[in-house]
């Protein structure tokens, strides 16, 4: 008698899904997720959500629409997602979230494994709670964000060899402001990215700068 295959419940964390986020990491993670679903596994996607302009807004987990059959949960008011633009204000990236909220999420879903694809946007409490609940955790590093604030480990067209991080501030001189980070994780920006006719119109019309060049506004 053939041994029955054991299906798993897997929580993937990545910095977003198309059309709001794209690139190799997103392609790899979503392809993996789709294949896991095809094989009968239960897959949950956990992504950074919208950031409120309200001061001291608390993290909240909200269920979103299915993505290729996977259940999606947003962490609203999580840490900013700098992508590959560097960090200007370190305090924005070291805030804590409600540990009880994280415990509640894991206890409700009881995942067999927690698969992290980037540290961008992820509060440290997710790692601490996963460890305390003895949830096996996998980290697939698609970038260098854990050791490089730009996530590229690349400086002046060469691999950065500054092992003591003494020159990071020079690479981060053009990092996004707090206001721009919030705009790019706002409801308005999500609406913009999800509507192809709007994005196409903006990119084809040089006189419109609101979304194509937000830096000019900030």
Locate predicted features.
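Short N-terminal targeting/anchoring amphipathic segment
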Residues: 104-122, 136-139
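Active-site proximal beta-strand in glycosyltransferases
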Residues: 113, 130-176, 180
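Extended, charge-rich helix/loop segments that form flexible
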Residues: 164-218
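N-terminal subdomain of nucleotide-sugar transferases
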Residues: 1-66, 107-109, 133-135
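Short, flexible loop segments at the rims of nucleotide/cofactor-binding pockets, characterized by
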Residues: 89-94, 115-116, 218
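A conserved catalytic-core segment of Leloir-type glycosyltransferases
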Residues: 45-109, 174-183, 191-194, 198-201
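Short catalytic/ligand-binding loop motif for oxyanion handling, primarily in non-cytosolic enzymes
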Residues: 19, 52-55, 122-125, 145-150, ...
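A conditional alpha-helix N-cap/helix-loop micro-motif detector
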Residues: 25-26, 94-96, 119
């Amino acid at each position: 008698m053939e041994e029955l295959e054991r299906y798993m419940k897997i929580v993937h964390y990545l910095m977003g899904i198309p059309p709001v986020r794209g690139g190799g990491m997103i392609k790899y993670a979503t392809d993996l997720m789709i294949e896991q679903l095809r094989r009968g596994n239960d897959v949950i996607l956990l992504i950074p959500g919208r950031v409120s302009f309200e001061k001291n807004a608390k993290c909240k987990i909200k269920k979103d629409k299915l993505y290729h059959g996977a259940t999606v949960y947003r962490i609203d008011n999580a840490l900013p997602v700098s992508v590959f633009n560097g960090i200007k204000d370190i305090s924005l990236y070291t805030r804590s979230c409600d540990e009880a909220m994280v415990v509640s999420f894991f206890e409700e879903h009881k995942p067999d494994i927690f698969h992290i694809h980037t540290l961008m946007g992820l509060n440290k409490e997710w790692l601490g709670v996963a460890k305390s609940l003895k949830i096996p955790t996998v980290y697939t590093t698609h970038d260098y964000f854990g050791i490089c604030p730009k996530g590229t480990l690349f400086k002046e067209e060469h691999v950065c060899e500054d092992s003591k991080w003494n020159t990071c501030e020079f690479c981060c001189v053009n990092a996004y402001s707090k206001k721009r980070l919030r705009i790019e994780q706002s409801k308005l920006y999500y609406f913009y990215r999800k509507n192809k006719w709007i994005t196409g119109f903006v990119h084809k019309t040089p006189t419109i700068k609101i979304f194509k060049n937000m830096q000019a506004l900030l």
